[in-house]
Amino acid sequence: MSDSTAPSAHRPRGSEDFGVFDDAKTYYASDERHTGRFANRTRTYSQSSLIKQIERLNLPEPFRRGSHDESNLEQGRRFLIQVDATLESLKAQEDTDGNMQITIEDSGPKVLPLRTAASAGYHRFEVRGTYMLSNLLQELTLAKEYGRKQIILDEARLNENPVNRLSRLIKDHFWDGLTRRIDASSIEIAARDPKDWTDDPRPRIYIPSKCTAQFEYYKQVALDRPEIRLDVQLLPEVITPEIIRDMNEKPGLLAVAVEEVEEQDPVKGTIKTLRGLPFVVPGGRFNELYGWDSYMESLGLLVNDRVDLAKAMVLNFCFCIEHYGKILNATRSYYLGRSQPPFLTDMALRVYEKIKHEPDALEFLRRSILAAIKEYHSVWTGQARLDPTTGLSRYCPEGLGVPPETEPSHFVHILQPYIKKHGMEFDEFVRAYNHGEIKEPELDNYFMHDRAVRESGHDTSYRFEGVCANLATIDLNSLLFKYETDISRTIRSLFDDKLVMPEEFCQGTPYKPGDILTSALWDRKAKRRKLTMDKLMWNEEEGMFFDYDFVNKKRCTYETATTLWSLWAGLASPKQAADIVKKGLPKFEEFGGLLAGTESSRGEIGLERPNRQWDYPYGWAPQQMLAWTGLLRYSFNEEAERLAYKWLFMITKAFVDFNGVVVEKYDVTRPIDPHRVDAEYGNQGLNFKGVAKEGFGWVNASYVYGLQIVNAHMRRALGTLTPYPTFIKAIEQLNEKALADLE
């Protein structure tokens, strides 16, 4: 395995050389690369069916292995490969469980001889080990997708430093694989809803009442392409829980931001049309814009210089706030009443720092801050989510009845006693209950908390079961403190302490068009929230913040990693931060990074009390990234580096051992197969054939973001798959030797 740690360290290109680490499209679409100067030397490789059978059965060949007689080793070894035959041999020999992946769990010999390009296929060199063979499977799968029958493959793509390889895949492939835009080019697929369980599922899009240009655009698409059966609906100006409920009979995609562009029409010449602003989805099966996933993804996009995508997602968020009143859980009709953890101010400020040299940068930031102000008032401190006694906020989305996006059978065990009580069939009861014809306060309470859990982004966890809407959570109130301080600082430093409220962002706020906002107002809000949280949520003895139950007027005891969000937001005092690091952090730190919650808080599990995915023993990318950033904010650099190293090591090890896998969440207590998750939703990102195309959005981001946290020595150690205890022991020995040399 190469020990280089940066793309610049890869071998240089010669005059006849191509980019060894080019993206797959560039690498496999080039005829010259794969047929050029070797084209007249490949006849030796055209083997009889007998030799192909020998390859397939892995029998000894009458040829010697020309392992070290390459004529161009200084340029790097290359293999001359017949794609289909080699792929067939590789799968037959190495993919012993038949899942189109080569992992440490396959029992093949883990060695495959390949013909060398320098010998025109006469000599061979053995490719060995799970990592190289799984990379070979991935490369051959890609080559086949690009229509190649024969390729010249650089060995460097097979033994590439895994940190470099995963970083490269994220930058060159995964982000593109997860990028969507909603317009005529994608509407047929994007507007189909896998959760449409009605009798007539069809593509459907809802347009905000004020977006007449989009409405006309999609109506024309429907007229031009009747075969796709696109249903275009205009939303009412005011959207109530009753309207959201009734829309469940016709679920659909919600329109997002577009831009006007010019394109060439073969008949009309240059015409103006609409094009959707792009956004990144969490995983490959999604086609809608998501809430806090988008913020987490933006952290990685900015590292990879994809400012265009991060900026477009901010603009999409502003569009959602202006037209739907909130940043939605996701842009589907059944999510119109539900938001997700708010990160808009930090996201916009990070993008602004990258584009502030551009002429429209300040206007971009102005609209983003105004949208955040509207969201702050109309959503998070609005009547539904604000506890007036404490002044703290909770997750509590609007909604009536049974959440429609779940499988119809999901709530059978909850509803069965009520169905029996009323002597009704399942569907009959759900319809009557949803429309208020049956009153069941206990059931209302259950679904209020269920919707709140989904809005929290932490669905599901025993932390929230049956109580979520009663809680002022440490995570939400830390985020709102960050909104307050971000808005205050931005108004003061960039808008001369005067920000004028325009009409489009006044709805749901206490402001009128033309009102001038100053930083002092937002400073007071932040100070008041900080004082209240210190009083109600801080536990001096435990050295942590806890959720506060304002119904029962008591502090909760569930230990959650979101206590570290107080560092990310700058809410914790220096002493509180030190206490959290000293007393709290050790409770969450595991082999692979931070746990979402502690084992003692989760409690015993069994058949009647199964695992929940946001509890022990699982770790999630958002918790890691916010913790690293928060620790660095308070100068706990060593702790941030250690946690980042553990998370990155776990991801890299699974990537190497399990055919390039990158998944939604990990069991941070499992050293061998942390991507295996035994929780209610399983794990996304596992079921690919041959090669992973997208990874998972916020894990991709955490990887490239985390590599900015660790130092160069750590990055080199990650490339050689050095576990953290081994790494830190070696560092300590080096330090001891250095001290001894000084004496």
From Swiss-Prot:
One of its GO terms (molecular function) is trehalase activity. Optimum pH is 7.0 at 55 degrees Celsius. InterPro entries: 6-hairpin_glycosidase_sf, 6hp_glycosidase-like_sf, Glyco_hydro_37, Glyco_hydro_37_CS, Trehalase_Ca-bd. Optimum temperature is 55 degrees Celsius at pH 7.0. GO terms for cellular component: alpha,alpha-trehalose-phosphate synthase complex (UDP-forming). This is Cytosolic neutral trehalase. It is found in: Cytoplasm. The gene is NTH1. Hydrolyzes intracellular trehalose to glucose.
